Every structure is written in C-alpha cells, then in structure tokens.
UniProtKB/Swiss-Prot annotation:
Location of the protein in the cell: Cytoplasm
NCBIfam families tied to this protein: PRK07564.1-1 (NF005737)
UniProt-listed SUPFAM superfamilies: Phosphoglucomutase, C-terminal domain (SSF55957), Phosphoglucomutase, first 3 domains (SSF53738)
Alphabetized PANTHER family for the sequence: PHOSPHOGLUCOMUTASE (PTHR22573:SF2), PHOSPHOHEXOMUTASE FAMILY MEMBER (PTHR22573)
Binding positions for Mg(2+) per the UniProt entry: 124, 299, 301, 303
Cellular component terms per the entry's GO annotation: cytosol
Needed co-factor(s): Mg(2+)
Root EC class: isomerase
Keyword Cytoplasm: yes
Active site: 124
GO molecular function per UniProt: magnesium ion binding; phosphoglucomutase activity
Official protein name in the record: Phosphoglucomutase, cytoplasmic
Gene name for this UniProt entry: PGM1
InterPro entries according to UniProt: A-D-PHexomutase_a/b/a-I (IPR005844), A-D-PHexomutase_a/b/a-I/II/III (IPR016055), A-D-PHexomutase_a/b/a-II (IPR005845), A-D-PHexomutase_a/b/a-III (IPR005846), A-D-PHexomutase_C_sf (IPR036900), A-D-PHexomutase_CS (IPR016066), Alpha-D-phosphohexomutase_SF (IPR005841), PGM (IPR045244)
Length: 582
C-alpha cells in the first residue's frame, strides 16, 4: 500500500470565486491559474461540518469536459489531505449531474459506505475545450446543490483563505473499475472507480415500466432519435435506450462524450441542437426522409432535456405540465398520486392550471433547483420544472434529462397501449393539442441577449424597476407601443419566502402582469462565464380551443413589441435582435 504525507500549501485569495446558482463557472484558463481550483475546493471543505469531511466519502466526477481529468486528481489529493476516508469516481471521470445525485442518495460502496457529498465538474450547457468553460459545484448529502447558506460561506472563505491541504498521492487510474488504497498518518484512504451508469439505470427501472416502453420502441410504427450533443448523456444513452429498451443504435446521435463536445454548444434548444432539429423536420430545409415520431436532446451534464415530436417542438413549460397531468396513469412511481408540483417563476403558468384542475399543491419558486429540493425534502413536491429545459421529480435532487425523456416515452406508451398493433398512433403533437384543448394554451417565448455589457444590463434592469412605481405611466407606454394588448395590473420584483425554512430570496426577476393573464419577465442570468445575459420571457394565455393552434411568434408579436419597447432593449444593449429565441 502506497504511503502518503499531507502538506499545507500557502496561498492567497482570488476575488472572483462567488458561486452562482450552479456553482463556479469560468474559462478554463482562469481555473488553470496556480491554486485557483485548490482555493475553491479548500474553501468548500472549510464551509462543511466536520462529519462531512473527516472520515467521509466524497463523489468526484462530471460531464467529461476539458480539464476534468486534471481536476479529479487535484481534488482527490486534497480530499486525502483533508482527512476524508474515500473518494468515489465514475469510470473515466464521467457521471451525469442527475447520476451524481442518485449515487449520493442510493449507492452503497464495496465496504458498505455511503457518500456525504460530491464535487460535480461541469459548466452544464456551456461549451467545453481549452478556450471554453469549466465549472465546479458542491452537492450535499441529500443529493441536491449546496443551499445559499453554504455557498455564502464558501464565498466568504475564498476571500480570506491562506492555505490549503493536499497529499502527495500519485495520480489514480480512473479508467479501470476497482479500488486503489493508500495509507496516511490517520489511516487508510481509498479511491473507488465504479461503473458510471449502473446505479442510475437501477433507479430508472424502479420508476418507469420499462416493458411498456420497450413495446413502444419495438413497434414498427414508432421511430425514435436521441442526441447527447457529445455530452455525458452518451455514457447512459446506449445502455438505456438500446440495451435496456431495444431502440436501434442508429437512433442515437452524438453519443460519444467528448472534452469539447465535438466543437459544439451542448445546449438542447432549437438553435444549438441543429442535427436533431433537422432530422425531426424542424430545420430550414425540409428533409425528404420522414422524420421520427419522437426526438430528444441533452446538455453537457445531462440534466436538461429538449422534447420534439415529428415537425413539432414541445416547450419546456408545456412539457412539465403534460408530465404532471399524465404522471399518475402513465408512470408507476407516481401511481399513488402526486404530493404537489412546482415551477420556477419565469416558467409559463401551464403547470398552475393543471395543479388547480387536479387539486394539487402548487409552488412558484426562484430559478435554481435547490428551491425545489427544499420542497421535495419536506414531502411537498413530486414533479417540477423550469423553462430552461429542466424537468425532474423527487427521485433525486437535480433536474434529470433522461428521466424526462423516459417520462414522455411512458406517456406515449400509455396513450398507445391499445393501438400498437392497429389503429393510428397517438403522437407527441396529439398529446400536446389534447392538453391545450383541456387546459388552454400558454403561448410562450424566451429571448436571450448573451454577453451583453454588464453595466448596460444592470442599467436596463434598474430602469424597469423604477418604472414599476407608476402603473399609469407603464400603461401609457404600453398603449403607445401597441394599442391592442391588455393593461398591466401588477408590476414587481419577484421575492420568495421558502415555506420550509422561512428563508427569503429577493430580486429574483422583474415582472409585469397583465389583466388577461399575460406576463413579461426580465432576468439577468448568472450562468454565463463572461458578460451578462438578459433573459426576456413573454407569455399569453389562450383558453379558447379554437385559438390554440396559432404560431407562437405570431400570437406573441404584440407583446414582444411591448417588451422590447418597455425595456428600451436596443437603446441599452445595442442589439437589434436576441442571440437565441426559444
């Protein structure tokens, strides 16, 4: 057994290590600065209770992006230096973010141990590579992201750090499954490399009826396509969709994980998932080949999802509402009923209507999955989602892209249980249109203005807040831009009081609410690594079934004009068009 010694290394603080909603994300060159990663990791260990460090078990893995392998070795040595008992690593350093959550909650090590937390190495949907983004976040013993109380402590520690602890271990082989043991002054330290997918697959099989999905996928009527965008979802896609569920291997796109995501942007939306969008018949040029019935994509760390039907896009806001409306019938895990449902504030109110109709508890929370986690830990929420392509349930404490795809396949299997032999297939588009006929439609779009000058973005938001003090003035501006829209009846900055722990989150987005249920929401996003991103959300509710079939951009055009005029978007940003429209 290799012996190791622990050393204390002097360091000085960096001023830019404040974690955002999903940890710390920066360019790779920033993380490669001497002691940059080490400072953040030590500041995290120092923010945790002693029982979550000394003698504890830590998971360290991620989406496989560039610099992950180096980071795993650095963190493993620091874990030994800080007195942890063992580190668990997914084979090749790969674990999806939802799989990390599942591993913390479900996995038992070869020696009977349980994990108390994890460092997840991901910048989610941001690009990867030597000149692109890297990220790190800490998840707690419930499998969810560190709450603000912990991330605030981490940030305070980064401002005063003077030293970090590390051990002189050799690099560990993370390509081969097995346990490597070392001996230090406080006893044994183990690094266990384990299969990245098996724990997660076992959990999925306990939630869904794999046999009914297998029947659907084996039907000649039903065709399927899944695009991992060269992210970590590829490590799960073949095992689940091909080996477990019998899909054709040719139905998988870009399912080999790559450090730079194949040079692409691993963000599952209509702009970046070009190959899937074209295959599903939604591209600018129509393919002569008949598109598949169902398509889906994942982001870099596989916690986000995009769901498509043949020539049909399902908005994430509709997706979570449709899953909630069908969960009890179609998914065995929910057969006893839903405890409640929740959505992030910018997400459309489609879920609210389902909750009201089904008499379910309903919660509207700020953006950030940790808010859902609190509700789930208290037994108040079963299904939740956000407009940024995140959907999930209380099976783990992260959003889960593959779970969402399996949920949709379960609903399709249930709706088609009688007609796989004969009769017309119930399609994704049919399911969505039937949902609108029952609950009404929330026309919805999101405009993203990426890498905007941070000063200009803050000024724009400040003007919108100031404007809220006079609804009369707001309505004069609105009617001057577009005379045929409803009037604004309420305007505020969204604030959330957590019903579980009483904590208050302020400044969570600027809202303008209209008399007819329409909404405009403006947010500054904290997930980019450079500049600011302004997100503008536009929503209009239509209850009349004869009016739910319009093109959403056409239906929303008057409100879009109001939003851009109210915010003086071009004046502040210099942009005549958004970077991305969803």
């Amino acid at each position: 057994m290799v012996l190791f010694n622990v050393s204390r290394v002097e360091t000085t603080p960096f001023g830019d290590q404040k974690p955002g909603t999903s940890g710390l994300r920066k360019k790779v060159k920033v993380f490669k600065q001497p002691n940059y990663l080490q400072n953040f990791v030590q500041s995290t260990f120092n923010a945790l209770t002693p029982q979550n460090v000394r003698g504890a078990t830590l998971v360290v893995s991620g989406d496989g992006r560039y610099f992950s392998k180096d980071a795993i070795q650095i963190i493993t040595k620091m874990a030994a230096g800080n007195g942890l008992r063992r580190v668990w690593v997914g084979q090749n350093g790969l674990l999806s973010t939802p799989a990390v959550s599942a591993v913390i909650r479900e996995r038992v090590g070869v020696d009977g141990s349980k994990a108390t937390g994890a460092f997840i190495l991901t910048a989610s949907h941001n690009p990867g590579g030597p000149n692109e983004d890297f990220g790190i976040k800490y998840n707690m013993e419930n499998g969810g992201p560190a709450p603000e109380g912990i991330t605030d402590k981490i940030y305070e520690n980064t401002k005063t750090i003077k030293e970090y602890l590390t051990a002189d271990l050799p690099d560990v082989d993370i390509t081969t499954i097995g346990v490597t043991s070392f001996s230090g002054s406080e006893g044994q330290f183990d690094v266990e490399v384990f299969d990245s997918a098996s724990d997660y697959i076992k959990l999925m099989k306990s939630i869904f009826d794999f046999e009914s999905i297998r029947k659907l996928l084996s039907s000649p009527k039903f065709t399927f396509c899944y695009d991992a965008l060269h992210g970590v979802a590829g490590a799960y896609a073949k095992r689940i969709f091909v080996e477990e569920l019998g899909a054709q291997e040719s139905s998988l796109l870009n399912c080999v994980p790559k450090e730079d995501f194949g040079g692409g942007h691993p963000d599952p939306n209509l702009t970046y998932a070009k190959e899937l969008v074209a295959r599903m018949g939604l591209g600018k040029s129509n393919s002569e080949v008949e598109p598949p019935e169902f398509g889906a994509a994942a982001d870099g760390d596989a916690d986000r999802n995009m769901v498509l039907g043949k020539r049909f896009f399902v908005t994430p806001s509709d997706s979570v509402a449709i899953i909630a409306a069908n969960a009890v019938e179609a998914i065995p895990y929910f057969s006893a009923g839903l405890k409640g449902v929740a959505r992030s504030m910018p997400t459309s109110a489609a879920l609210d209507v389902v909750a009201k109709s089904l008499n379910l508890k309903f919660f509207e929370v700020p953006t950030g999955w940790k808010f859902f986690g609190n509700l789930m830990d208290a037994g108040l929420c079963s299904v939740c989602g956000e407009e940024s392509f995140g959907t999930g349930s209380d099976h783990i404490r992260e959003k889960d892209g593959i779970w969402a795809v399996l949920a949709w396949l379960s609903i399709l299997a249930y709706k088609n249980r009688e007609n796989l032999g004969g009769g017309k297939l119930v399609t994704v588009e049919d399911i969505v249109h039937n949902h609108w006929a029952t609950y009404g439609r929330h026309y919805y779009t999101r405009y993203d203005y990426e890498n905007v000058d941070a000063g200009a973005a803050k000024e724009l938001m400040a003007c919108l807040v100031k404007l809220q003090s006079s609804l009369t003035e707001v309505n004069e501006i609105v009617s001057g831009i577009q005379s045929d829209v409803s009037k604004v009846v309420h305007a505020d900055e969204f604030e959330y009081k957590d019903p579980v722990d009483g904590s208050i989150s302020k400044h969570q987005g600027i809202r303008y609410l209209f008399e007819d249920g329409s909404r405009l929401v403006f947010r500054l996003s904290g997930t980019g690594s450079e500049g600011a991103t302004i997100r503008l959300y536009i929503e209009q509710y239509e209850k009349d079934p004869s009016k739910t079939g319009r093109d959403s951009q056409d239906a929303l055009a008057p409100l879009v004009a109001v939003a851009l005029g109210l915010x003086k978007m071009q004046e502040f940003t210099g942009r005549s068009a958004p970077t991305v429209i969803t």
